[in-house]
Curated annotation (Swiss-Prot):
A motif (Effector region) lies at residues 36-44. This is Ras-related protein RabG1. It is found in: Cell membrane. Keywords: Cell membrane, GTP-binding, Lipoprotein, Membrane, Nucleotide-binding, Prenylation. One of its GO terms (cellular component) is plasma membrane. It holds the Pfam family Ras. GTP binds at residues 13-20, 62-66, 120-123. The keyword 4Fe-4S does not apply. It is a lipid-anchor. One of its GO terms (biological process) is vesicle-mediated transport. Belongs to the small GTPase superfamily. Rab family. A lipid is attached at C196 (S-geranylgeranyl cysteine).
Length: 196
């Protein structure tokens, strides 16, 4: 596998939005246990995926709690192809802070880094505070995919990482595959073609 076939992907967002859970659910779905998430200190995990018949290695990095102290350094962002910016759909503040995380990406990220906006914990329907249409509007303004996920049930987790991989594939490799994302838990798929 060439270096160009490795996609470095970061998970960022406020503390406790479910970044580690998403990472573990995606990379090891059969062994996913919520109880082990808090005890696990993850740096990064790998998973191979296929796009247009070509295999790519996703190297997915977790902040391992550094964001609590706002000590994410520029080295974390170095060489990143894509960033999943995560918030918790039941916690308005984590959504309000998404703009700050976008600024961090601009400040430290490489030019043209791909982004996907992820609203996690969509299984907690009764406690939902962040309206998906507001998040979708924001993502549309930025020209990036938006998707709601649940690391607990697994809903849309694979789709979120695949949307990220598709973005990187198109932006960095020059592939033409459009991201097809099902943004809200249970809504019909949506094709995104107008990414800058
Ligand atoms: N209901 C529900 N709970 C979730 C979901 N994802 C994560 N959680 C819970 O939310 C809490 C925080 O999850 P983490 O995966 O540790 O979140 P994090 O963003 O990595 O947190 P830090 O390590 O502080 O950065 C844990 O108790 C998880 O079990 C989800 O999709 N639904």
């Amino acid at each position: 596998m060439n270096d160009s076939d490795v996609f470095k992907i970061l998970l960022i967002g406020d503390s406790a939005v479910g970044k580690t859970s998403l990472l573990l659910r995606f990379t090891d779905p059969n062994n996913f246990q919520e109880t082990s998430v808090n005890m696990t200190s993850v740096d990064y995990k790998n998973k191979n995926i296929t796009i247009d018949g070509r295999t790519f290695n996703l190297q997915i990095w977790d902040t391992a709690g550094q964001e609590r102290f706002r000590t994410i350094t520029s080295s974390f962002y170095r060489g990143a192809h894509g960033v999943l910016v995560c918030y918790d759909v039941t916690d308005q503040l984590t959504y309000n802070n998404v703009g700050l995380w976008m600024q961090e990406i601009q400040r430290y990220g490489v030019l043209g880094v791909s982004r996907v906006l992820v609203g996690n914990k969509c299984d907690l329907e009764d406690r939902k505070l962040v309206n998906a249409s507001i998040a979708q509007e924001y993502a549309d303004i930025l020209g990036i995919p938006f998707i709601e996920t649940s690391a607990t049930t697994g809903v849309n987790v694979e789709e979120a990482f695949m949307a990220m991989a598709d973005e990187i594939y198109r932006n960095h490799i020059g592939g033409s595959k459009p991201s097809v994302v099902k943004p809200v838990c249970g809504s019909p798929p949506r094709t995104k073609k107008n990414i800058c």
